[in-house]
Swiss-Prot record:
Keyword Cytoplasm among UniProt keywords: yes
Record's subcellular location: Cytoplasm
One example GO MF annotation: catalytic activity
Annotated Gene3D superfamilies: Endonuclease/exonuclease/phosphatase (3.60.10.10)
Family: Belongs to the UPF0294 family.
Predominant localisation class: cytoplasm
Superkingdom, taxonomy of origin: Bacteria
Upper lineage: Bacteria, Pseudomonadati, Pseudomonadota, Gammaproteobacteria, Enterobacterales
Pfam families: Exo_endo_phos
Gene Ontology cellular-component annotations: cytoplasm
Gene that specifies this protein: yafD
Keywords (A to Z) from UniProt: Cytoplasm
This protein's name: UPF0294 protein YafD
Length: 266
């Protein structure tokens, strides 16, 4: 699916830019350009949300109230309507979307809004074998104030597949990117973990990548068959706060996490 895999970058006052996959992170990681840090503070706030193609009312007010103070907003099922693009470009320096499939008017897929321009951007797609619909993922990298580089992986995992072969296949190129990155990592999104084999595959992947799971005390995450679908994983950072916002603005509840880029937990 590589020929159909690209990201669209939206920046205020500029035409949308198409970005193709750059190739192996291993060959590029040592030569990334310098950039402005994602945050000048000692914390990084993120919002993670499957926005349900903005089909319900109040989605924009949720983003305005909870997203505008975040350094990163990781959306899944984000449809590039004029309202969403306007919000993104008015409040963030960059918005990168990977079109998973093109709807009649506006493409839908994962979209990462960021308070700094990424110094690396790698779009990924995987097709669901049953419905033939694609799901997308996006890997971006941002400088931190301490000169480290933060890798951010925004994931919407394949949903309809028999067994976990295709599910695990989607994680492989993500793992290749993470494995060649020595700095901190945030991997988050809708992982469609509605079965035990899927949960096991995701947890196994997280262990292999040395990623820890963010825990939510009042866990109001969307569930299917009793299992949560949305996750935030991380390494090389500390978790200061983590909460779930209960809303009717989507069929998923947004996850709010604050990290500090200081010395990570042992």
């Amino acid at each position: 699916m590589r020929k159909n895999t690209y990201a669209m970058r939206y920046v205020a006052g500029q035409p949308a830019e198409r970005i193709l996959p750059p190739g192996s992170f291993a060959s590029i990681g040592q030569a990334l350009p310098a950039g402005e840090p994602l945050s000048s503070e000692e914390r990084i706030r993120i919002l993670v949300w499957n926005i349900f193609k903005q089909q319900r009312a109040e989605w924009l007010s949720v983003l305005k109230n909870y997203g505008k103070d975040a350094h990163l907003v990781l959306l899944q099922e984000a449809q590039t309507t004029p309202e969403l693009v306007q919000f993104a470009t008015a409040n963030y320096l960059a918005a990168d979307q990977v079109p998973a499939f093109v709807l009649p008017q506006h493409p839908s897929g994962v979209m990462t809004l960021s308070a700094a321009h990424p110094v690396y951007c790698c779009p990924l797609r995987e097709r669901e074998p049953i419905l033939r619909l694609a799901k997308s993922a996006l890997v971006t990298v941002y400088p931190l104030p301490d000169t480290r580089l933060l890798m951010v992986v925004n994931v919407h995992a394949v949903n309809f597949s028999l067994g976990v072969d295709v599910y695990s296949k989607q994680l492989l190129p993500i793992g290749d990117q993470i494995a060649h990155h020595s700095g901190p990592v945030i991997m988050a999104g809708d992982f469609n973990t509605w079965s035990r084999p899927r949960m096991n595959a995701l947890y196994r992947f997280a262990r292999e990548m040395s990623l820890r799971q963010v825990r939510f005390t009042d866990d109001q995450r969307r569930r299917a068959f009793g299992r949560p679908l949305d996750f935030v994983f991380y390494r090389g950072l500390n978790v200061n706060e983590a909460s779930v916002l209960v809303t009717r603005a989507s069929d998923h509840n947004p996850l709010l996490v604050e990290f500090s880029p200081g010395k990570p937990e042992q």
